[in-house]
Curated annotation (Swiss-Prot):
Family: Belongs to the protein kinase superfamily. Tyr protein kinase family. SRC subfamily.
Quaternary structure, from the entry: Binds to the cytoplasmic domain of cell surface receptors, such as AXL, CD2, CD4, CD5, CD8, CD44, CD45 and CD122. Also binds to effector molecules, such as PI4K, VAV1, RASA1, FYB1 and to other protein kinases including CDK1, RAF1, ZAP70 and SYK. Binds to phosphatidylinositol 3'-kinase (PI3K) from T-lymphocytes through its SH3 domain and to the tyrosine phosphorylated form of KHDRBS1/p70 through its SH2 domain. Interacts with SQSTM1. Interacts with phosphorylated LIME1. Interacts with CBLB and PTPRH. Interacts with RUNX3.
Phosphotyrosine modifications at: 192, 394, 505
InterPro entries, per database record: Kinase-like_dom_sf (IPR011009), Lck_SH2 (IPR035850), Lck_SH3 (IPR035749), Non-receptor_tyrosine_kinases (IPR050198), Prot_kinase_dom (IPR000719), Protein_kinase_ATP_BS (IPR017441), Ser-Thr/Tyr_kinase_cat_dom (IPR001245), SH2 (IPR000980)
Protein name as it appears in the record: Proto-oncogene tyrosine-protein kinase LCK
Protein kinase domain segment(s): 245-498
Location of the region described as Interactions with CD4 and CD8 in the Swiss-Prot/TrEMBL record: 2-72
Associated pathology: Proviral insertion upstream of the Lck gene causes overexpression, leading to the development of thymic lymphoma.
Function: Non-receptor tyrosine-protein kinase that plays an essential role in the selection and maturation of developing T-cells in the thymus and in the function of mature T-cells. Plays a key role in T-cell antigen receptor (TCR)-linked signal transduction pathways. Constitutively associated with the cytoplasmic portions of the CD4 and CD8 surface receptors.
UniProt-annotated catalytic positions: 364
Keyword flag NAD: no
Lipidation (S-palmitoyl cysteine): 3, 5
Enzyme class: transferase
Length: 509
């Protein structure tokens, strides 16, 4: 008999199992016919997994070798095309375009960093997600395209060198959910979820739980589905000629212009905001745009390029589902449960926490300025633009175009905009989310809203709004700006709104 010593003993899961006195790990007789791991020599093996024969170890690949996760068609002067599965050697790693050489053709050029993964790592595996938080794992697995049993393995947020398994499941009370399992490490380099069975590598673990649930909530069906990433913007293309853009479909029109889906240079799908002539100074816009392009975060719409001659064009990443206020009214938006709605709010708070950290101000935070991707990821748009608008109907603050119902009292009365006035607006945005896009202060005109706010009035709790969420709204609507919470606080509360009292991980099977 023998054992494999683990640095993570879990004695309470080992009833009715003989264990080693030193390490408390299961001891299995050589002639055991149970489904426990089989010891051969010094190895513990899974009877449900077919192991590869004993082969000499492969020569380790060099650290600068990558494998293409997707094919790439060159579209710029100096970039390098390649096919999915092709190996490349990285020559220079800087920014979002890396200089590389194809081992297939020998050609050199620049490649998009997000189309490749390190060859000598887990990164090329479709089920492995390197830098993914527990919350984002849930968002990915619950996104359209994934089903019961979809799964991924991610790096542990708290323990370097450890991993977690996240699996999509169905709960009778909660509906579609994601369950998480800690993957524990053995001293000999192996892994286990349940101490009943260990694996020499993560590939073996995945293969086993694909064949049988063996104590998990369900069998693993297929890796979490993700879309081919959008290539990074070519860094030298900032002020671009108007003729490089082809406007294809008008997505909407607002008070200051139109938004179009279009293509840049015939190959890159983008959103183009065309501003009405005279709505802002081109020089002031360019100065602000140069600041805006430095604000890069996964929860902010990426600003790609500008056309600075009037009519001004703002070229950004394209978001398939358009504005949040419109999406919430669609059949897909109406079906969203309160958990998903609050997750959207948490994503917006995360983006605003970054803006807060950068000492920036949005000035026009509302659901119309939040965009939604096809995987229901929310991103903040139009940050900073409001201060440049030169339309009298807007700058007068009482004018017809000014968003009174979203604006903090000190900004309405004195023109004082701070990150705390953005917090007030976020509280209003929360009402839009839980009412699926209803206009705030229903039945009130703008002058009535101003008069009522001066008397201390606050919007009543919307139908189907949890009491705890309404409490959060009321914190955002404190009269004194300094009494309102930070966006970092709002993000933390919304992130854990339904999970604060639940265990983050499933017990060992």
């Amino acid at each position: 008999m023998g054992c494999v010593c683990s640095s993570n003993p879990e004695d309470d899961w080992m009833e009715n199992i003989d264990v080693c006195e030193n390490c408390h790990y299961p001891i299995v007789p050589l002639d055991s016919k149970s489904t426990l791991p089989i010891r051969t020599g010094s190895e513990v093996r899974d009877p449900l997994v077919t192991y590869e024969g004993s082969l000499p170890p492969a020569s380790p690949l060099q650290d600068n070798l990558v494998i293409a996760l997707h094919s790439y068609e060159p579209s710029h002067d100096g970039d390098l095309g390649f096919e999915k599965g092709e190996q490349l050697r990285i020559l220079e790693q800087s920014g979002e375009w890396w200089k590389a050489q194809s081992l297939t053709t020998g050609q050199e050029g620049f490649i998009p960093f997000n189309f490749v993964a390190k060859a000598n790592s887990l990164e090329p595996e479709p089920w492995f997600f390197k830098n993914l938080s527990r919350k984002d794992a849930e968002r990915q697995l619950l996104a359209p395209g994934n089903t019961h049993g979809s799964f991924l393995i991610r790096e542990s947020e708290s323990t370097a060198g450890s991993f977690s398994l996240s699996v999509r499941d169905f709960d009778q009370n909660q509906g579609e959910v994601v369950k998480h399992y800690k993957i524990r490490n053995l001293d000999n380099g192996g892994f286990y979820i349940s101490p009943r069975i260990t694996f020499p590598g993560l590939h073996d673990l995945v293969r086993h739980y694909t064949n049988a649930s063996d104590g998990l909530c369900t069998k693993l069906s297929r890796p979490c589905q993700t879309q081919k990433p959008q290539k990074p913007w070519w860094e030298d293309e900032w002020e671009v000629p108007r003729e490089t853009l082809k406007l294809v479909e008008r997505l909407g029109a607002g008070q200051f212009g139109e938004v179009w889906m279009g293509y840049y240079n015939g190959h890159t799908k983008v959103a183009v905001k065309s501003l009405k002539q005279g709505s802002m100074s081109p020089d002031a816009f360019l100065a602000e745009a140069n600041l805006m392009k430095q604000l890069q975060h996964p929860r902010l719409v990426r600003l790609y390029a500008v056309v600075t001659q009037e009519p001004i064009y703002i070229i950004t990443e394209y978001m398939e589902n358009g504005s949040l206020v419109d999406f919430l009214k669609t059949p897909s938006g109406i079906k969203l449960n309160v958990n998903k709605l609050l997750d959207m709010a948490a994503q917006i708070a995360e983006g605003m926490a970054f803006i807060e950290e950068q000492n920036y101000i949005h000035r026009d935070l509302r659901a119309a300025n939040i965009l939604v991707s096809d995987t229901l990821s929310c991103k903040i748009a139009d940050f900073g633009l409001a201060r440049l608008i030169e339309d009298n109907e807007y700058t007068a603050r009482e004018g017809a175009k000014f968003p009174i119902k979203w604006t903090a009292p000190e900004a309405i009365n004195y023109g004082t905009f701070t990150i705390k006035s953005d917090v007030w607006s976020f509280g209003i945005l929360l009402t839009e989310i839980v009412t699926h896009g209803r206009i705030p202060y229903p039945g009130m005109t703008n002058p009535e809203v101003i008069q009522n706010l001066e008397k201390g009035y606050r919007m009543v709790r919307p139908d189907n709004c949890p009491e705890e969420l309404y409490h959060l709204m009321m914190l955002c609507w404190k009269e004194r700006p300094e009494d309102r919470p930070t966006f970092d606080y709002l993000r933390s509360v919304l992130d854990d709104f339904f999970t604060a009292t639940e265990g983050q991980y499933q017990p060992q099977p």
